[in-house]
Amino acid sequence: MKTKAKMSPKKKIVIAVGAVVVVLTAALLFVSNYLVNYAIGRSGDGGDREVALEVEASPDSVEAIIETNRAQYSADIDAFAATHPGENVTLTAADGLTLHGVRYANAETAATHRWAIVLHGYRGDHTGVLNLAMPYYEAGYQVIAPDLRACGDSDGDYVGMGWLDREDILRWIDFILADDPQAEIVVHGISMGAATTMMTAGEDTPENVKVFIEDCGYTSVWDVFSSEL
């Protein structure tokens, strides 16, 4: 009658350690995949973020004045959107994605060749920069408000956080120059759009790009995700 060989303590330890490593690796992969999808996935849970703009204030406080001005400005933006629907435009990114934007053509001042590309923030779309598009338009600029990749009506599975988007903005610059070779262009972004602006500024842009405006961009992706996650 055969007897089963006893497993040595060393072998038991190796098997136990191996099992722990497998479990920890699987858990790490699961958590990592969840966090990536949450933070930059197009349909991730991170897309349900809402920024509270309201503040409680007494009638005589500075906050009350700010809220009054904000309400008026919001009404002005709504009026602009209602009377200036813009033109839907698209282009193809270097990796084949179809990118969408809205062009606000200003026929009365087209001869000035002044253009502005206005860039929205994290999880936003072109409607989030109407507050930028409106004053540029009223100042006589032609305005392009892109939906960054994986945002709005643009293709893409993952938010670019500015790095992928920088090449897309170069395409939007070329889009403008194909229409107006004499264009003088401002690139103006907020939040993630500001990071996109700065990353675009590091590229070899045409001399037609005269100004980059970075409004409240993040210091690093690590800082952003540390806050978001």
Task: Walk through the language-model features, giving the residues of each.
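An N-terminal hydrophobic leader/cap segment in hydrolases
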Residues: 24-91
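A short loop-to-beta-strand scaffold at the N-terminal edge of the catalytic core in hydrolase folds
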Residues: 94-105
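Short beta-strand element of the alpha/beta-hydrolase
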Residues: 112-121
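The serine-hydrolase catalytic nucleophile loop
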Residues: 122-135, 148
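Conserved alpha/beta-hydrolase
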Residues: 135-155
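Alpha/beta-hydrolase active-site loop
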Residues: 159-180
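Alpha/beta-hydrolase fold nucleophile elbow
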Residues: 180-191
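Hydrolase active-site cap/lid region
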Residues: 199-229
